[in-house]
Amino acid sequence: MKKSFSYNNMLKKNNIFLIGPMGAGKSTIGRQLANQLNMEFFDSDQEIETRTGANISWVFDVEGEERFRDREEKIIDELTKKQGIILATGGGSVKSHITRNNLSDRGFVVYLETTIEKQLIRTQHDKRRPLLRSSSASGNTRDLLQVLAKERNPLYEEIADIRISTDEQNVRVVVNKIIILRKKSSL
C-alpha cells in the first residue's frame, strides 16, 4: 500500500478509484458508493464500450489485448482528471505503469479483494469477460485466475490506500467501510 501522503495528494483525494480483480464487485459497489456520496460514477469498461460502440469482448478479440489496454489507459487518464468521481476500473488496468501512477496521484484508491473461489462463483455465467471466455471453454478458469492474481495482486497493493475484502460482506457494508476509512485517512 502507498506509504506517504503529501498535502497536494490529499487535495486530490476527492476522487475514489476502485481497483481489484474481476468479480470483486467494483462496478456494483461503485454505483452504490456514488449514489450514497452523491458523486458521479464511471466504469472504465463501460466507457470503452460506449466510445467504441462495441462490447469489451469484441474490442479484445478484434484489436487484441495490447490495443485494448492502450484504450483503457487513455480513458482512465481522461477520467482521473475529473473531480468528485467514483471510478470502477478494469481488473487488468493496473498492468499499465501510467495508469497506476494516475490512479495513485489523482484519487483515493480502494483495493477490493476477493478470493478465487468467490471470483469463480461471481463470474461463472458472465460471457462478457474476454479473458474468461477462452479459459472457460478449455476448463482452465481457476488456473487463469490464479495466474492473474499472482501477476496483478502486487500491483493492486502497490497503489492502494486501503484494502477491503468483499467476500463475506454485502455491498452496503463495503460501501460504509470505504466511507469510514476514507474519512479516517484524510484526518
Swiss-Prot record:
In which residues is ATP bound? 23-28, 129, 169
Which locations, inside or outside the cell, does it occupy? Cytoplasm
Q: In which pathway does it act?
A: Metabolic intermediate biosynthesis; chorismate biosynthesis; chorismate from D-erythrose 4-phosphate and phosphoenolpyruvate: step 5/7
Binding-site residues, substrate: 45, 69, 91, 152
Free-text remark on how the cofactor is bound: Binds 1 Mg(2+) ion per subunit.
Residue numbers binding Mg(2+): 27
Q: Which keywords label this protein?
A: Amino-acid biosynthesis, Aromatic amino acid biosynthesis, ATP-binding, Cytoplasm, Kinase, Magnesium, Metal-binding, Nucleotide-binding, Transferase
Bridged cysteine pairs (disulfide): none
Query: GO CC: one term?
Result: cytosol
The UniProt record lists the EC number as 2.7.1.71
Cofactor names from the entry are: Mg(2+)
The record ties this protein, via Pfam families, to: SKI
Reported function? Catalyzes the specific phosphorylation of the 3-hydroxyl group of shikimic acid using ATP as a cosubstrate.
This protein's assembly is summarised as: Monomer.
Protein name, as recorded: Shikimate kinase
Source organism phylogeny: Bacteria, Pseudomonadati, Pseudomonadota, Gammaproteobacteria, Enterobacterales
